[in-house]
Amino acid sequence: MSFRQAFDAERLKRDADRRVREDAERARQEADEARSIELYEILAADPGFLAERKLVLERSRYTVGLEHPDFRLRAYFEDAQINVTAADKRSATTITAAPTKQQYVDSVEQALDVLAQYLADETV
């Protein structure tokens, strides 16, 4: 094998490895996005409850949020985990309130349970 052939073979190998990594990352991102849509649809299924609790449901890429005048609940989806947070707007010094509670979960059902717990904590 010549030096050129060895170089070309190495470059092809690296390109193939890069494509595998990119495909895996894209698949992870698509799964995270699908799970965020799933949680959003579960929460959106009861608009009466959201209105009763003065919650505004929002979704952006990988994030589902519940906004209330006094607090913010969020679920952020990344690498097959869900970071669920609660933030108190009443004591915030800036527009973006820092999370006061945080829990990592693995499933949409667990995220729903933690959001319900955080909502109960805020409304008791």
Model segments located where?
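Short intrinsically disordered terminal tails
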Residues: 1, 120-124
